[in-house]
Amino acid sequence: MIETGLSGKVVVVTGGAAGIGRATAARFAKEGCRVSVWDRNEPAAVDDLDFQRVDVSNTESVTAAVQAVVARWGTVNVLVNNAGILRDGQLVKVKDGAVVSTMTDETFDAVTDVNLRGVFVCTRAVAPVMITGGGGVILSASSVVGVYGNFGQTNYVAAKAGVIGMTKTWARELGKYGIRVNAVTPGFIATDMVQAMPEKVLQGMRDHTPLGRMGSPEDIANAYVWLASDAASFIHGAIIPVDGGIVVGT
């Protein structure tokens, strides 16, 4: 069994009320971490986790949450930038040779505000705490589509590709302070939201994955825990695929 060295660490998980975020918060708690869940929505059961109602795209909201966590536990050792939303649509939709719709500014901004700006705002707020504390780990959720693009997801792909760029930049900037920065690129993950899709769509996801199945939220949570652990102490600036081989097969 890998010794993670995470017991007693203070971990912030954004978007931690459900899905991958919820599984991630639970997995860090299992390692003996003190976990603060940041989300717009309160989880159904917080157990012994701290909960902060946070809009990750809003500087004041994030600053207040950081102050609350530091007031309670003294520091932040690990930040998991997991919060994300979808608002899919084509850049330009054409029917019978005529343009019938385009992606609106509001649709583009809604996704990039959370999925890209939110990662920036949270990392900017937490990094000084980690520098003062002598180091830490910053992990962010990108996506396989941030690597190869995807039809109907201009906003989402732009944000997830941006997360990859920010991760590599911050690895260069923050490494000297003992802060490791990495990202994961999940593939098709069987969250409750995804599993509610039609079976034909789900089968298409499985068929597109070389392992022949979708991943679970716990698969991503395990990757986050490993990347935050002592076992990954020399992994820095990496973009780790957790996708069942999708990128390899694309």
Task: Map each language-model feature to its residues.
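Active-site helix of classical SDR
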Residues: 123, 159, 167
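Short, small/polar-rich loop/turn modules that mediate ligand/substrate recognition or access, typified
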Residues: 175, 180, 235-237
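C-terminal helical subdomain
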Residues: 183, 206-231, 235, 244
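The beta1-alpha1 cofactor-binding region of Rossmann-like NAD(H)/NADP(H)-dependent oxidoreductases
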Residues: 54-65, 105, 218-219
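Short C-terminal tail/terminal secondary-structure segment
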Residues: 1-2, 148, 224, 236-250
